[in-house]
A protein has these predicted regions:
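Short, P/G- and charge-enriched loop/turn segments at secondary-structure junctions
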Residues: 1-4, 71, 106-111
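Conserved N-terminal beta-strand and adjoining loop/helix that marks the start
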Residues: 1-23, 43
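Short hydrophobic/aromatic beta-strand or adjacent loop that forms the aromatic wall/cage
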Residues: 9-13, 80-84, 117
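Conserved Nudix-box catalytic region and its N-terminal flanking loop in Nudix hydrolases
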Residues: 18-61
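Residue-level detector of high-confidence beta-strand sites
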Residues: 26, 71-73
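A generic structural signal for short hydrophobic patches within well-formed alpha-helices
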Residues: 41, 128-129
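A short coil-to-beta-strand element that immediately follows conserved catalytic motifs
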Residues: 62-71, 95
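Active-site-adjacent beta-strand/loop module that shapes the phosphate/pyrophosphate-binding cleft
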Residues: 74-109, 121-126, 139-149
């Protein structure tokens, strides 16, 4: 099977922006990069439901489905697409210091169960390259401008 013939997986995620246009990122444990809360859906699970479930599992943040703006599906890596949703939150609505991850995976070092995400932050769009994975930074740079998304969410 050629590389392009392999089935593409789809992760569903939520791009959270605050009133200032900063994006909410979560640090992927045992890596150097930060990410948006996202993950694969369960069989039969709608993309919005998968995105909200992953958000809750990876951050402890619960949002109402009606708040989500469906941004659609984006090519992310050679083997994966992202189905993304966006939401704007009010100032102070999400405190990164209060977030917690309940989704665990085995550590590459010793096999002990550790949280998928271990830290949280608000980041201005100009600093995305310093924090996000190359794939996510490229997506925000080429296909989904955070500045334009902020304008869209605020109606500006």
């Amino acid at each position: 099977m050629k590389r392009g013939d392999a089935p593409r997986t789809v992760s569903c995620g939520v791009v959270i922006l605050d009133a200032a246009g900063r994006v909410f990122l979560a640090h992927a444990t045992d890596t150097t990069h930060w990410d948006i809360p996202k993950g694969q859906g369960e069989p039969g699970e709608a993309p919005a439901d998968a995105a909200l479930r992953e958000l809750l599992e990876e951050t402890g943040i619960a949002l109402a489905p009606a708040r989500l703006l469906d941004l659609g599906r984006f090519a992310y890596r050679h083997d994966k697409d992202l189905h993304l949703f966006a939401v704007q939150v009010a100032e102070g609505e999400i405190d990164p210091g209060q977030c917690t991850c309940t989704s665990l995976f085995p550590s590459r070092r010793d096999g002990s169960m550790i949280p998928e995400m271990d830290a949280y932050r608000w980041t201005v769009p100009a600093d995305i390259d310093a924090y996000a994975s190359r794939s996510l930074a490229r997506l925000f740079r080429t296909k989904l401008s955070l500045v334009d998304l902020h304008r869209r969410l605020t109606g500006a």
